[in-house]
């Protein structure tokens, strides 16, 4: 790897490797070359439209305020927007394919036609998957229209094996075509109305089943209300049959579907099925949940039959119609922070508006570029030596895909680095101030996007089939003027109240794009931008890697010797923005005069605790705040969001159920939770060391009069507590907790001194705090038992697990103490999973995907 590339990424070898292995083409050795390659292609489309726009001038006064005064984009200005991954980052296939001679699609995701209810239909869908995968991209299919098991068929079998029986066929096709560098990813969805839904819910409990696909259930409001009310629910096939046409009192439940227009119905208890959904989600991380009515009510495309979504892409952020596709781009939010990590830090809202306006314009250009690349695919198919009979299905697929692409002109404009943006502004991720700033950013973003897509409709024409009366309700007429009354779904209703100027212009002139924004996974993108990923909080700002020491090396620091006698050196890998923060601060006041490479784990822990990421990492965030943040993001996002709520392994089924219910009520379109360890059967466990079978009692070492102590502030059951941990040799020895009433809520270090029996004081910065007062008997028992366990040598990891097994909810006292103690689990013990590619245990789960922080492997790209 060349030195210049390493220097470009500020010595971040992971970023350099990801770019070189995934995106460099045609001998490229530097990202500037890739950015120039892409800018040239975008500019080609831009110049074409500018010629048309400049021929007439009567459109100027119709444009938005910014649209009237902006300068035309050039190849140079487009390049500057891409350069250094600072503002706009085209995702995945766009970076690797645009401007090359590869015969591939620029789209990141597709939804295929649902399989027809016949073997021929199923076979055709299988073929469609193959043809999409071979040109890159993930695909979603909905199998709700395949008949239930044991229903009548007009063949020698006489009865169907059911919709679920074909899932492995589609999954195996995905795994097959994903080999040798070709990229396959699959989402299979099923309507909760389907009589086979229980088999669908349970199928991935068998870890050998459907291993090549994500699965999700389409949940409607009627089912969710039946769960809430512990009521009955009617499964039916066809799934879109209306209950109201059934004379339910006069029909025999479970009557077989005859294939003649009759309906197969089945009466169930909704809560029983919901409990099975929660069990699978908690223990196996699937199925995901799609809140289908929420999606339809908040999707601008859903009021149009020809664009109404039928399924989502594999990561769940793009709901699409059959043969529809989307091309993704992400905007780096960190770049809008002026004076990051200082008291003067603030957002440049003017620049946010401009960049999102221009980004959407580039996204529209990308639609035309995709049409060109599909033409190349079509010409390649036509020139292939196979007979027309063999080629016809693939040819038809790409012709329909091009037509759908140009008709709706979908754009998938997203964001990344939200977590780092908040840290740079000195906000905790889930603070009230953070929620307010997120809302302000999203409103500015939406205003820019609306202005752009309406301006583009004026300049270039609206999407095919636009009809203002499908979208808005108005009173009055053109002669006397009209008043915007509201929208025909919740999305247009929101526009008519929150963006009144844009709504009226959209009613008059239309818009260019049927749908235009999303929040997609940005695993590889965030490695290149060197920021937090998507809208997720940072997982951790540092982690430790071990490097094996060559026996011939001399004078090398040895940090660890394993059971085989091999010597290892530990070194820190710093999150790039954490490193930027350290460079902007005088870290010597906390860890002394040290170079970054000399920082040990204790140094990093000390710095982390005074950084803006402290108590704002993925495992620190209260799940209700995560849902509230996602709801704000969703309100101002036209499609959906890929995001994951991380939960401890001891979370209860009831808590998982509450999280999903809360998300549905908050208006989310889809939701994913990841319970720590729930995919341990899928990923490879590294915990293979034999356990000592002997049992011994162990006496506690004598307590010194004085211990090093750390005080943390936490909330349990609505009360604020100070939790003080006493340590010997940096290992926890005892735990105290009591009510905290002071204003200053910052953690601090000091000394715990035993004054006399049952009287301990905490001395910090000249202040004395009592540590054994104001606790209930239950709270005192918890801390005493925790202290006794630590003093007698219990592994802190198992103590945390036991505290988390209490029946209380996530905010109970025992679990609040566990959250503090978890910070003391030694590096390397927190994760028992390892990456299938590089073997690292630095595996996290975010944005719906497992990701390796060591090599960059991500299921979502």
What is each model feature region?
Residues 823-832, 841-846:
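Short, flexible, mixed-charge glycine/proline-rich loop motifs
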Residues 807-823:
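Domain-level detector for trafficking modules
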Residues 846-852:
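Short cysteine/histidine-rich zinc-coordinating motifs and their immediately flanking basic loops
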Residues 833-836, 850:
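Cys/His-enriched microdomains
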Residues 836-840, 854:
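Short, cysteine/histidine-rich loop/knuckle motifs that typically chelate Zn2+
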Residues 1-794, 798-806, 844-846, 857:
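Extended catalytic cores of very large enzyme megasubunits
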Residues 859-861:
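Short metal-binding segments enriched for Cys and/or His
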